[in-house]
Amino acid sequence: MIRFDNLPPEVMQAMCTPMHLILPPSQSHRTGALYLGSFSAILDPTLLTSHAVGALVQVLDAPWLPSVDAHAAQGNKLECYRLDILDSSTADLRPHLEATVRWIDDRLRRGINVLVHCQQGISRSAAVVIAYLIYTHNMSYDAALDLVKRKRACVKPNSGFVRCLQEWERQWRPPAGERPSMRRVMTTPR
């Protein structure tokens, strides 16, 4: 449960904003934009259309969630990748990360704007975006978390996800002496 007393104004503002731009589109690389947000973002077709969101990554455990087909029936064509996982420190995100970040990377490389969302845009979806930055931009966990928090101040992956992401960093970001030259990088985070 999130406690709202004593939260800094920027965190409250971020929690009330449906989605934030994490990586802008790149005209030179013809890549899409990466957004991070909450469930409320997908309930606003005007918002999705105004940001040209063409793909969703839904990181939820919500069998009641309406299908994306209902949104497509309204004239909006959205690709959807669903990751059913609880926001729990005991939930293991690792088995899902590689397929999820590759799916995101594929859409972005095709110039499709992607929104990664969970219920509140604080823990689950933030963890996926951080994993994406580690994997594609060779960022450390701390650097990726810092970038995402600068864009969406309310981000706070749960302790289990933090452990998973630190293991993910060790897997995909070998020690400096063993690092290959640039790999997988497609855009530069701002």
What residues fall within each predicted segment?
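PTP/DSP superfamily signal
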Residues: M1-M15, G32, E98-V114, Q120-I122, ...
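Glycine-rich, flexible N-terminal cofactor/catalytic loop recognition
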Residues: L21-A70
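Intrinsically disordered, low-complexity regulatory regions enriched in Ser/Pro/Gly/Thr
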Residues: Q27-R30, L47-A52, A72-K77, R107-R110, ...
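Beta-strand cores of modular interaction/reader domains in eukaryotic scaffold and signaling proteins
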Residues: Y35-G37, A55-Q58, E79-D84, L115-H117, ...
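Amphipathic alpha-helical protein-protein interaction segments
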Residues: G37-A41, T46-T49, L86-L93, L97, ...
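Short polar/charged helix/loop
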Residues: I42, D61-S67, Q74-R110, Y135
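Short coil/turn segments at secondary-structure boundaries
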Residues: L48-H51, V68-A72, P95, V128-V129, ...
